[in-house]
Amino acid sequence: KQVPNFEIAYFAGGEPLITEEHYMLIDEMIAKNKTDIQLRYNSNISNFKYKKRDIFKLWHHFSKPIEVYASIDHMGDKAEYIRSGTKWKTIETNLKKLKKARNVGFQVNTVYSIFNALTISHFYKYMIDNHFYTPNSPVWTLYNMGSPEHLSVHVLPEDYKVQALEQLHLTIKYMSDLGFKKTHIHQIEMCIPWLNSKHTWHENQLEFKEEIKRIDTLRGEDFMVTFPELGALYKVPKSLRP
């Protein structure tokens, strides 16, 4: 009943693009010819079809550009480990669809954590080189993970933080050389003071190792294969060995 009064419809998590209620609401908007609504989404962009319905075809009915905030924390097998259930090939395909769509704009949101701190420049370079992120793109938001503390960048030992800092500087230089705006680069710069604001390896290393052991056992994955750059940090504690 409220659809005629809508100006903005913001669909947040879990994952709105695979919920029945979302499609019912979109159908009602179209049926009532209320298609001047600004649609905004938080999504992991894993699914653009639901029960054979293509969201892009529905979006074509709307006059205002659709805004998609894509939650992506890395690429390849690292992305699949960080967000369980992710299929990277599908994410790549859907990024291309978003880039190609005429009435859709998208912005990347990334959680900065121990999982991507030592390879963040590789992720940015991939996104930039494939034109998923350009100097004309909306700002790519980088969120500093605060909790759980044992998976934040604070848990990195000092020598690893030196590498993480180098990764941030490499990303800043690459973006600067390509003409990215200060607002784009500021997101990277804000991670520098955060990286060194706490040093928690000694108090959190056991919890970190227990968490990785739990994840690998539960999912049948291998942290050391996926994150060789962090492998030396992870040795199964004696209390968890067979």
Predicted features by range, described:
Residues 2-5, 62-63, 94-106, 171-184:
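A structural motif corresponding to the C-terminal end of an alpha-helix
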Residues 27, 31, 129:
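Short, well-ordered alpha-helices that flank and scaffold nucleotide-derived cofactor binding pockets
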